[in-house]
């Protein structure tokens, strides 16, 4: 039996679930009411926004981790969009002084941020996922980062930082050069497959079939398109080019042929070594580079199953060959990353924004998390403030529905890593405050078993949005928390789980705050313990209401029922 429960002072009033047609009718009326309420509140928020400063200000000092009020969290970092008073009201709308950001932030760890102090500060400023870029560094340095992140998670049990290992992939790169080579427009410049060659007009490449893969007239893009050359001729071991757009060629720069992909395996021998390293160190996610088809994902997942490794696979969409296979690639994966750098090098650059929107939409429809990456705050590698275009780029990704946004060089080797995270947090938070909270009923074409779960997630979201309550979900697998995230409730989803690996994975999903807690055989004890945790952590207050959701084959409520929704008042 399925039931909705609404309770006051812990005395539930139960309403049994009605037939689907009636449920949909009920949900429509609730949605209409919620839409009207949202319209008024949106107008009020616009008035508040007009009073807020739009100038992003940064301070050189690092966040104080020893605040008298306890450890600093990313919610306590002052932002330019914050109201001057702690709590304010406008009409009937209560303005929260300490809202929680729902879009997650992935930070690449590198020389600028690999110390214990900086990893702590990144986490407190807003980092949700630490990314290890296997194109740089060695296993020893990455092991140090993994250990530091795990130390942080152990020290702050209410905080969760996941670890993502990003494979190098089948990249074609130029060789090492003693000093940067200045390429000038019209200049002749050569690439050779002979190793160790470096001169003013010739440099080596790391790919033996490079000469076979390129043709006369092909456009070569260097370093993500920062420089471009046209192929004029080729011989047995040399490709002769003419510079179209010049620039500074440094060591190991990435090479692309516009409209083509190299005939290399998606997972190289080095990648397999790095993947085994990830298994041994229990990372949470793999980000697999240059995935061209679903077979690559199946091969990796088969390997992980053989190892007994519970690691999710994020596919990086960055190859021209992947575009015709998008649906099957995303379906086979556990999520996707829009890697716009190489995508924009292999395809016409004007296609990238449209592909970004399409990939986000596809992931959302399949309930897979999606990360938007590359050049989001590129100027902040060297400058303390972002360009206005970069701010808009973050806002667009948030509005399109990305689960996470990613920083690469900004935090790996940039001069202002903490400021970059703070800007990303601030812009995402401000953008989220302007988004609609309307929900759409799940399609009737969904199989019945999964349809029941999506229906309850839809109704729970509608109820939480209408009553303006956060959601508490109890989950052993993470499935219901993920489904709730798909409907984008206006408040936080507190996902309580008794599985550490599930807690780590859920941190990537939009709006989900995972919390580890052992479940009791006594349902009321489990509820009370969860509410007590939230109150003690300052995440909820006495007198507030919360929507409780539980769904699954092993419910913590009644044995005969697998789906429940309750609304409860938090007691002191």
Per-region residue spans from a language model:
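Non-catalytic helical/linker scaffolds that mediate oligomerization, partner binding
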Residues: 2-572
